[in-house]
Amino acid sequence: MPKINLLLLCGGGGAEHDISLMSARFFESSLAKSDKFSVLKLVLDKHGHYHTEDGKLCDLTNRREIRFEDNSTPAWSVDYVIPCIHGFPGETGDIQSYFNLIQLPYFGCESEASSNCFNKITAKMWFSALGVPNTPYIFLHQLDDDAIKQTETAFDNWGSVFVKAASQGSSVGCYKVDVKANIANVLKDAFSYAPYVVVEQTIHARELEVAVYQYQGEVVATLPGEIICDSNTFYSFDEKYATNSKARTDVVADNLSPEISQLIRDYAVKAFKGMKLRHLSRIDFFLTADNQILLNEINTFPGLTPISMFPKMLQNHGHNFTEYLIDVIGQQVDLT
């Protein structure tokens, strides 16, 4: 059987562009351990242009081919694509819509599921409809005096709030507000990232994560891992990726009862199946001191950097990432 031509697409030009490049390197190294794939990695820039790592411009056509601007390079037929793009246009579902249009099989969640999870307002409506408890919130559709008053009222009721751009990556356009006088400026910043904003009650709780993925025909939910931040910080974009980050990650959370651990995993699977996710996800929860479980968010294309939790939790669960990729891809294209 000849190798399949696998397009590894990364970048996107957004706030998480560089993280996407790091994740793509993990995919490259994992795919290289198999003899089933011929891999072409392309970077998508902020202008929507595709190019190779050495700068050759190209395009993905509706004939499922990569055609190069330089006519001396022959067209490259694409059998399968991994859209390793965090944020727009990957996790938003936009690029998946194009793949569907040209009937190109791809890795990861489909367009509607991606869009529903990426928008924090839509996601919360789904969580509630599925009976999965989540953090108390209000949402705002424009920056005006009424929005500021609503947020100030929420602050008065809850004592502290998180203000989040509704349609950005998990830590992009996200601000913790402990001083009421800062609300107007924070809202202005959040609205610069997205047309809708979510204001959530600050939850003082443990931050737990579950890797949920499909493998050998089953939906797998790992034991919860934990993000442990300094008491004066939250898991912001900088805390995730800065070299001097004070945060640490535990692949398996300590001091978690079997009953609570299983309930978190059950909620994660319920959300995965109910929202019709596919292939992979990282589902994040809060656990309060009185054992209240709250779903925080779903990441439909979690990071795969050296510090990322998803690949570590998958491996800790006893699965090999390369074998996992072969299994998922083999459900869609013939690898025999």
Curated annotation (Swiss-Prot):
Binds 2 magnesium or manganese ions per subunit. PROSITE patterns: ATP_GRASP, DALA_DALA_LIGASE_1, DALA_DALA_LIGASE_2. This is D-alanine--D-alanine ligase. It comes from Shewanella frigidimarina (strain NCIMB 400). GO terms for cellular component: cytosol. Its cofactor is Mg(2+); Mn(2+). Its EC number is 6.3.2.4. It is found in: Cytoplasm. Residues 124-330 form the ATP-grasp domain. Its main location: cytoplasm. Mg(2+) 1 binds at residues 284, 297. ATP binds at residues 154-209. Cell wall formation. SUPFAM superfamilies: Glutathione synthetase ATP-binding domain-like, PreATP-grasp domain. Mg(2+) 2 binds at residues 297, 299. The keyword Transmembrane helix does not apply. GO terms for molecular function: ATP binding; D-alanine-D-alanine ligase activity; metal ion binding. GO terms for biological process: cell wall organization; peptidoglycan biosynthetic process; regulation of cell shape. It catalyses: 2 D-alanine + ATP = D-alanyl-D-alanine + ADP + phosphate + H(+). Pathway: Cell wall biogenesis; peptidoglycan biosynthesis. InterPro entries: ATP-grasp, ATP_grasp_subdomain_1, D-Ala_lig_Van_CS, D_ala_D_ala, Dala_Dala_lig_C, Dala_Dala_lig_N, PreATP-grasp_dom_sf. It holds the Pfam family Dala_Dala_lig_N. Keywords: ATP-binding, Cell shape, Cell wall biogenesis/degradation, Cytoplasm, Ligase, Magnesium, Manganese, Metal-binding, Nucleotide-binding, Peptidoglycan synthesis.
